[in-house]
Amino acid sequence: MGGAISMRRSKPAGDLRQKLLRARGETYGRLLGEVEDGSSQSLGGLGKGLSSRSCEGQKYNQGQYMNTPWRNPAEEKEKLAYRKQNMDDIDEEDDDLVGVSVRPKVPLRAMTYKLAIDMSHFIKEKGGLEGIYYSARRHRILDMYLEKEEGIIPDWQDYTSGPGIRYPKTFGWLWKLVPVNVSDEAQEDERHYLMQPAQTSKWDDPWGEVLAWKFDPTPAYTYEAYVRYPEEFGSKSGLSEEEVRRRLTARGLLNMADKKETR
């Protein structure tokens, strides 16, 4: 599936994986020079993947970027606040990071079942999302990329709430999110912390799980999200309001559901 599509779009799809992998790299490149002396040597092979713009010397101040390592131990509450802060500070760089045209190249259109399947296989054939850590920023990059390159309105990407495997709510999208284990040593190691975004994605997740994209063809035939968690679809599930609330409460999701509109 997707043979003709692959020939037509081979270059853009290959670029998408690199853009996602660099989603945190640019931020890291900016702060490394101030965190350690001789940062170019410490980066090793990773430095080759960073643009010259991202590696230019810029003064780093504590708290300027989220998820940067600290030299002095902090209280757990302070660590949590520090790691979660300033996500908005990098929003303005998203367009530049994605590197796509400002305006969509094709007319805007809604994501459909067939289009979701085509895009899923096309991305898979080009190396796509497999094994890439999920984060709120990478979520936005994928939305922006498909909007600008394919004209897909960015209202389609949604997953079940967890905890555990997050199934796509868009029927036909074949990329789910699976929890992955990151060792305690890796989470505490500053070098690993700089190079891997696993420590950043857990703060994007209300359950504190580290998630990665994984291809799964099953949702092409079975609406896994709806079958497993109909309560997350609200009135569209066919369940009574009382049953929806009961199920959400049992899963610890009622407070989250109250904060956003039930779909």
UniProtKB/Swiss-Prot annotation:
Domain of life: Viruses
Membrane topology: Lipid-anchor
Domain statement: The N-terminal domain is composed of the N-myristoyl glycine and of a cluster of positively charged amino acids. It is required for inner plasma membrane targeting of Nef.
Species the sequence originates in: Simian immunodeficiency virus (isolate K78)
Any single GO CC term annotated in Swiss-Prot or TrEMBL for this entry: host cell plasma membrane
Keywords tagged on the record: Host cell membrane, Host membrane, Host-virus interaction, Lipoprotein, Membrane, Myristate, Viral immunoevasion, Virulence
Compartments in which it is found: Host cell membrane
Protein's name according to its UniProt entry: Protein Nef
